Amino acid sequence: MSPSAVQSSKLEEQSSEIDKLKAKMSQSAATAQQKKEHEYEHLTSVKIVPQRPISDRLQPAIATHYSPHLDGLQDYQRLHKESIEDPAKFFGSKATQFLNWSKPFDKVFIPDPKTGRPSFQNNAWFLNGQLNACYNCVDRHALKTPNKKAIIFEGDEPGQGYSITYKELLEEVCQVAQVLTYSMGVRKGDTVAVYMPMVPEAIITLLAISRIGAIHSVVFAGFSSNSLRDRINDGDSKVVITTDESNRGGKVIETKRIVDDALRETPGVRHVLVYRKTNNPSVAFHAPRDLDWATEKKKYKTYYPCTPVDSEDPLFLLYTSGSTGAPKGVQHSTAGYLLGALLTMRYTFDTHQEDVFFTAGDIGWITGHTYVVYGPLLYGCATLVFEGTPAYPNYSRYWDIIDEHKVTQFYVAPTALRLLKRAGDSYIENHSLKSLRCLGSVGEPIAAEVWEWYSEKIGKNEIPIVDTYWQTESGSHLVTPLAGGVTPMKPGSASFPFFGIDAVVLDPNTGEELNTSHAEGVLAVKAAWPSFARTIWKNHDRYLDTYLNPYPGYYFTGDGAAKDKDGYIWILGRVDDVVNVSGHRLSTAEIEAAIIEDPIVAECAVVGFNDDLTGQAVAAFVVLKNKSSWSTATDDELQDIKKHLVFTVRKDIGPFAAPKLIILVDDLPKTRSGKIMRRILRKILAGESDQLGDVSTLSNPGIVRHLIDSVKL
């Protein structure tokens, strides 16, 4: 064959290969489009799961007097309409009915001068009223049902639990309130830092602080000393309350040592109250600064009156990470927050006073504040306080607790459910779980397959799952199904707005409301509600810039959402988790899902980074399964893995979504609640490793250096 013929043959072969590649790309694009259409179809027509009659699940003793608080979906729709159209009537009547006031309020809210609706700019509720949070949580129940269980405690080790009645709780709280007042000099309006594990004394502490009109600032008892120091100083805390040590998952945590380290740089702190949990004599005690819980309590009587506070007086600060990385001290008022906690307890979970409410959350987060402490005690039921973890001493611990204490409502994060699902169903066997009447999910959207496992294995496909969407800033639920036979459920959807929440989906670019049959944009709320946070401590400008200024007239949640043809709301994740590549808006969650489907992948986090050609490009941080077996892989083998994962995305979604970078790492930067901090990944990719902001919420701060080194490689 002549050279020209050979060249011609090669060109034909290349042309053929190009045609094949084009055909594959076209097929891939078509597949991606089909997948999108399929996902749209799923979103808009996923099977609705009706709630079964609840009374069939009740114990006979409860079934004799139980009836749901709402009479089906139409009753919810009627009341929700009233709460939006006449919030003064709705919330005024509820506040009068469910809260005890030392001085009645004379105005429900301050109306917006333009709309007449509750104002974001002047958000104040139940004006000129006075009340006390502790009285509403403890005293009124101790007077009526003194011997009723208020707190059921389950220690880290099985068999270490005990119960506290409302009468006993009142006496304990009154003594600690006097310790704060007379031994420690705390006054109304002072801030008290709390660094305690999940023990009854932590709940007693919060109630004692609120009893004297002070402000509690709980710091999760897993934060480092530096993080604790920063929160003590920012919150202007005068005293700190802690334990000598704590127990979790069979391990001893040196709580007091962390406090001592933090207090080296906290000039405003006068005293530390120490509850000796383990009585370890080697734990340092610095008198006269440090005071012993038991010794001080003995000095005081078992009753001490409440201090009335104004409706808008601060109840607590709770620090949450912001998009800039600097923690925000979110400030909640007293009356509005209490009403939000109580109403969601009543209607979301269909709670009754005979119930045993188990929230598997920590008081260091908003879930613990609202649904371990305030919600259950406001309602007068029993709250179950669990010190341990779902995996210790084995994966049946939650189910053991539910059966032993006849728990009626169980509220937990999908992170824990995924762990328990992975552990296997054998740990659920031999458990009745018949006391359960409602299952809850909190903290992140729950995947449909986890929802279905939760429903089938724990709920026996007989009881509702309330997939709740809310935030530290909201104080209580924003979007949620309602138990008690009210809301037909769609697995993966948070369903409908709670009372008083006028939830809308906005076009992220124009800020206009989207009212189509399938609206997808950013989730916002159109008017204020009682439990909405009032400000960021000492930084109201940041409060405005973060929540109210992005879309004037709305509260900006920071989350993307879709509303389907039936009005169900689907939470799509943070709006900063969207990558714009060559004009294509790509959901990082969608790309992550494609990668995670591969059997060699354990975890994945996708973020965007700047690209000169496409504006943004996609980077995927990937954790492989069986990491030990990959540690000896050659560079060529690792490159093959990366190419394979890129091809997976191209195949599942389309070429436009293919990651430009695949970075293999040992772990991802996660908070202690299991959320991936993608902000850190974005900063590292942008070459801003020295501007990571607050990384104290990471469960493994040491992973940051590994991630930086992996990107450099």
From Swiss-Prot:
Compositional bias per record (Basic and acidic residues), positions renumbered to this chain: 10-22
Motif FACS: chain residues: 552-600
GO biological process, one term: acetyl-CoA biosynthetic process
Sequence motif Microbody targeting signal, residues: 711-713
Binding site for ATP: 443-445, 467-472, 559, 574, 585
InterPro entries in the cross-refs: Ac_CoA_lig (IPR011904), ACAS_N (IPR032387), AMP-bd_C (IPR025110), AMP-bd_C_sf (IPR045851), AMP-binding_CS (IPR020845), AMP-dep_synth/lig_dom (IPR000873), ANL_N_sf (IPR042099)
Residue numbers spanned by region Disordered: 1-39
Annotated residues for binding of CoA: 248-251, 367, 582, 650
Keyword annotations: ATP-binding, Cytoplasm, Endoplasmic reticulum, Ligase, Microsome, Mitochondrion, Nucleotide-binding, Nucleus
Principal subcellular localisation of the protein: other
Record-level GO cellular component terms: cytosol; endoplasmic reticulum; mitochondrion; nucleus
Top-tier EC class: ligase
Reaction(s) the record says it catalyses: acetate + ATP + CoA = acetyl-CoA + AMP + diphosphate
Pfam families xref list: ACAS_N, AMP-binding, AMP-binding_C
Enzyme Commission number(s) of this protein: 6.2.1.1
Induction trigger: By acetate, acetaldehyde and ethanol. Subject to glucose catabolite repression. Inactivated and degraded after addition of glucose (at protein level).
Domain of life: Eukaryota
Subcellular locations according to the entry: Microsome; Cytoplasm; Mitochondrion; Nucleus
Entry GO MF terms: acetate-CoA ligase activity; acid-ammonia (or amide) ligase activity; AMP binding; ATP binding
Further facts: Present with 2890 molecules/cell in log phase SD medium.
Domain notes: The FACS motif is required for catalytic activity and substrate specificity.
PANTHER family attached to this UniProt entry: ACETYL-COENZYME A SYNTHETASE, ACETYL-COENZYME A SYNTHETASE 1
Protein family according to the UniProt entry: Belongs to the ATP-dependent AMP-binding enzyme family.
Reported function: Catalyzes the production of acetyl-CoA. Provides the acetyl-CoA source for histone acetylation in the nucleus. 'Aerobic' isozyme of acetyl-coenzyme A synthetase, which supports growth on nonfermentable carbon sources such as glycerol and ethanol. May be required for assimilation of ethanol and acetate.
Protein's name in the database: Acetyl-coenzyme A synthetase 1
Species this protein is from: Saccharomyces cerevisiae (strain ATCC 204508 / S288c)
